[in-house]
Amino acid sequence: MDMKKYAAEAIGTFWLTFAGCGSAVIAAGFPQVGIGLVGVSLAFGLSVVTMAYAIGHISGCHLNPAVTVGLAAGGRFPAGQILPYVIAQVCGAIVAAELLYIIASGAPGFDVTKGFASNGYDAHSPGQYSMMACFLTEVVMTMMFLFIIMGATHGRAPAGFAPLAIGLALVMIHLVSIPVTNTSVNPARSTGPALFVGGWAMAQLWLFWVAPLIGGALGGVIYRWLSEEPTGVVAGAKAA
């Protein structure tokens, strides 16, 4: 067991969840100077860029169970390492959500039941999109995210630019899908806040595991076929 890789994944996912969800909970609607949808999108993207440069050489900087599964499906990551990576990612997201909850609770009028950056469908979708619309959005967005990750980290891709391409992709994904699902494409990121919201957020959490995992696997398989990469697994392959 390589505990350093798992610790890096936990820390990286903590940062993604704390910075990304924190921007939504604390800064998005701040009177007069709130960062809004664009600011939240940038926060998620920048969290990935910064962590990719910080821990990409340690764990590959997956920060996301769908990325880990997608890389395995694409032949870039050993299947036997999926479970410990996912556990580390979920733990990091939960700790981030707990810290964010403590901080946000210090503001008067804070109500965790209003969403706490949770993902949802139907009445709990920001735009009240249907379950099917939200499911398709998460599948397609995660599929394209993995496609970009696979391409940006390919051996023939320009060296050193993968974190930027991947971070910008996540910004684009959020710009499009925040109104639909509040943007997941990451089961760990969805799990942390949902645990504190409870109720509807936990009841709808299944979609934000199933759809991203399907999308991630599809993205990995499609890029593997398209690029005609070797079928052998490369241990420790990087996501960013």
Swiss-Prot record:
CDD domains linked: MIP (cd00333)
> What are the site positions for Involved in tetramerization or stability of the tetramer?
21
* Subcellular location per the Swiss-Prot or TrEMBL entry: Cell inner membrane
TM segments? 10-30, 35-55, 82-102, 131-151, 160-180, 194-214
Cited Gene3D superfamilies: Glycerol uptake facilitator protein (1.20.1080.10)
Catalyses: H2O(in) = H2O(out)
Q: Where is this motif: NPA 2?
A: 186-188
Site Selectivity filter — annotated at: 44, 174, 183, 189
Q: Which keywords accompany this UniProt record?
A: Cell inner membrane, Cell membrane, Membrane, Repeat, Transmembrane, Transmembrane helix, Transport
Q: What is its main location?
A: membrane
The cellular component terms of Gene Ontology attached to this UniProt record, alphabetical and capped at eight, are: plasma membrane
Listed GO molecular functions?
water channel activity
Q: Which domain of life is it from?
A: Bacteria
Place the motif NPA 1 on the sequence.
64-66
This protein's membrane topology, according to the annotation, is: Multi-pass membrane protein
User: Does the record bear Protease in its keywords?
Assistant: no
Pfam entry (one): MIP
What does the record say about domains? Answer: Aquaporins contain two tandem repeats each containing three membrane-spanning domains and a pore-forming loop with the signature motif Asn-Pro-Ala (NPA).
NCBIfam families this protein is in? MIP, PRK05420.1
**Protein purpose:** Channel that permits osmotically driven movement of water in both directions. It is involved in the osmoregulation and in the maintenance of cell turgor during volume expansion in rapidly growing cells. It mediates rapid entry or exit of water in response to abrupt changes in osmolarity.
Q: How does it assemble?
A: Homotetramer.
Q: Which family does it belong to?
A: Belongs to the MIP/aquaporin (TC 1.A.8) family.
Mind telling me what this protein is named? Aquaporin Z
Biological source species: Bradyrhizobium diazoefficiens (strain JCM 10833 / BCRC 13528 / IAM 13628 / NBRC 14792 / USDA 110)
The top of its lineage is:
Bacteria, Pseudomonadati, Pseudomonadota, Alphaproteobacteria, Hyphomicrobiales
User: What's the gene?
Assistant: aqpZ
